[in-house]
């Protein structure tokens, strides 16, 4: 009998002890093989009481299901540096797949881990179904560890879902799978309108800011990532004809992302989802035409 594919769960958390327990519980109770899960927590050193809560309330639940969990302690970086948390966690992962997860996420689908495992060996960005009402992104991205091994990072911006989804759409390696979660977030469900939610700082929507998702340097960085991944895809026998056509001027890189965007989309990331190249924002902000997507 073959050894189950390990799935590494990347889970930064702050100030949400009970929510964290509920979120993890939903993952392990719905997994076909919970023992294949490797939960990697990113916790701030000043998150009072969390370490004790993990030992007293969460560890026994994990031991019962034989789920490995490792907590990585950080000096507080803030939401605007969320990518630094997940980049570090990814570097410590031993699984074949990296699965982004949130402490306000609730897994709804039994056997969700099997849906990921079906794609093992494929270099794709996978997406769960969600309650964002037609958002085109992979809100909690799922990707092979080889992505990190190749790039030495997952994202260079706190909007990790946007960063990875844009790259995947440009290469036509985005796939939504038959597994669903509930994002139990204040702007979506009315729940958990807490300090953690209120203190979020988005690096998106102001492309004049060098740290913004839409800044020209950030767009150039994503295109460099696309070119590197396209090279790798050819090496493994999975060439991206889509990207070749983009480079030849025959294909809109974001055609499928636009087609997957509902008019009623809810949640963060709407700026980039509905304006993937930042053109509208450039017109509004009157910044240089250099901010366009450069291929």
Over which residues does each language-model region extend?
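Active-site nucleotide-sugar/metal-binding loop of Leloir-type enzymes
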Residues: 86-97
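Short beta-strand-to-loop element that shapes/binds the nucleotide-sugar donor at the catalytic cleft/hinge
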Residues: 124-141
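A conserved acidic beta->alpha catalytic loop
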Residues: 41-56, 105-106
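Short, acidic, metal-binding catalytic loop of nucleotide-sugar glycosyltransferases
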Residues: 25-36
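Short beta-strand/loop segment that forms part of the nucleotide-sugar
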Residues: 35-48, 72-76
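Short beta-strand-to-loop acidic/aromatic patch adjacent to the donor-nucleotide binding site
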Residues: 95-106
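C-terminal catalytic/acceptor-binding lobe
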Residues: 162-254
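Conserved donor-nucleotide/metal-binding helix-loop-beta segment in metal-dependent transferases, i.e.
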Residues: 110-128
């Amino acid at each position: 009998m073959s050894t189950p594919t390990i799935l590494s769960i990347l889970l930064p958390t702050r100030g949400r002890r009970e929510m964290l327990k509920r979120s993890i519980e939903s993952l392990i109770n719905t997994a076909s093989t919970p023992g294949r899960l490797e939960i990697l927590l990113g916790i701030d050193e000043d998150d009072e009481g969390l370490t004790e809560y993990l030992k007293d309330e969460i560890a026994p639940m994990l031991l019962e299901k034989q789920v490995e969990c490792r907590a990585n302690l950080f000096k507080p970086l803030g939401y605007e540096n969320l990518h630094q948390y997940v980049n570090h966690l990814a570097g410590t992962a031993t699984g074949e797949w990296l699965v982004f997860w949130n402490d306000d996420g609730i897994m709804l689908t039994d056997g969700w881990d099997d849906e990921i495992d079906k794609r093992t060996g494929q270099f794709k960005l996978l997406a769960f179904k969600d309650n964002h009402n037609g958002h085109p992104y992979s809100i909690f991205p799922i990707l092979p560890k080889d992505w990190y091994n190749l790039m030495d990072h997952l994202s260079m911006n706190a909007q990790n879902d946007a960063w990875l989804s844009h790259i995947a759409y440009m290469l036509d390696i985005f796939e939504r799978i038959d597994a669903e979660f509930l994002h139990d977030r204040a702007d979506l469900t009315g729940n958990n309108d807490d300090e953690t939610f209120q203190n979020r700082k988005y690096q998106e929507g102001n492309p004049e800011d060098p740290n913004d998702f839409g800044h020209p340097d950030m767009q150039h960085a994503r295109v460099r990532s696309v070119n590197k991944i396209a090279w790798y895809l050819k090496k493994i026998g999975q060439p991206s004809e889509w990207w070749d056509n983009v480079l030849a001027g025959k294909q809109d890189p974001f055609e499928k992302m636009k087609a997957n965007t509902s008019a009623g989309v809810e949640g963060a990331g709407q700026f980039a989802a509905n304006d993937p190249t930042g053109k509208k924002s450039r017109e509004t902000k009157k910044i240089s035409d250099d901010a366009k997507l450069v291929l």
